[in-house]
Amino acid sequence: MLLGCNYSKELIELLQENIVDVDYIKLGLYDIYNEALEVSLSLRPVLLHGLGFNERATMKNIKDVDWKYVNDSIKNFKSPHYAVHLASCMQDWDKDVTEEKIIEYMSETTKAWIDNIEVPFLVENMPYSSIDIKEFGIMDICVKPHIIKKICDETKAHLLLDIAHAKVTARNSGEDIYSYLEQLPLDRVKEIHIVGTHEIEGIELRDYHLEMKEEDFEILQWVLSKCSPDIITLEYGGPGELYSWRSDKNVLKNQLIRLMNICRKY
């Protein structure tokens, strides 16, 4: 099994010092990251995550996507596959939209990606919390396991299983994390995202890309007993000031060494 990790200057330092090893560096294809992308590609293939089209399952600009640019970018950065968030946002719909219409549109968007890109296509499960609703307009329909399974089954899309997102959704929906995970199409998992979460006053859980706790490693091991992904990607760390307080070099090193050992077993 291969290992990926979010780009950060701390990751680059660890790689250059031969302290850790990863197979992929994850980063979005945005102009503000041009230098980081160049450095990353000089060291490892890049797991592209974001191409600048505001990609999501209910994106209304799907007809404007430049597929040549998409495929050229994937090829140039040696990304093995590409994923889009399986997100349905309130701002994408009229108030009277039906659940059936939303599901149909998400499936059509997924099929458009599958039909037009030259690598395997994945959909990523979303987190569901008050901040995801308030800031991003996330609708509960897109985090329901039977909907995720339906779209994967009908379109043959692979699943990018984000364990932190699943934890957030399960907790904030009053469901056990293992029960929630078991309902997802684990047979379709091609990549796993893993990172620590943040608890708000002992009630709500949020995805803040923090250090993994022991519970996170336990959930990962359980998931790996149920599926066989190609890649595990650690999402701790990132570029710039936004991630500076959660890109501790020693914390990153310790997590990666542990994940390297896990990957060697599979």
Question: Which residues are covered by each model-predicted region?
Answer:
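A short secondary-structure junction signal
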Residues: 132-135, 163-164, 170-173, 204
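Gly/Pro-rich active-site loop or hairpin
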Residues: 56-63, 96-103, 169-230, 237, ...
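Hydrophobic faces of well-ordered beta-strands that scaffold small-molecule active sites
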Residues: 1-7, 23-27, 44-50, 80-84, ...
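Active-site acidic/histidine proton-transfer and metal-coordination neighborhood
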Residues: 63-158, 168, 214, 250-251
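Acidic (Asp/Glu)-rich catalytic clusters
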Residues: 14-20, 33-50, 64-80, 111-118, ...
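C-terminal helical cap(s) of enzyme catalytic domains, especially alpha/beta-barrels
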Residues: 243-266
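N-terminal ordered "arm"
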Residues: 2-36
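Active-site beta-loop-alpha junctions enriched in small/polar residues
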Residues: 6-10, 28-32, 51-55, 87-89, ...
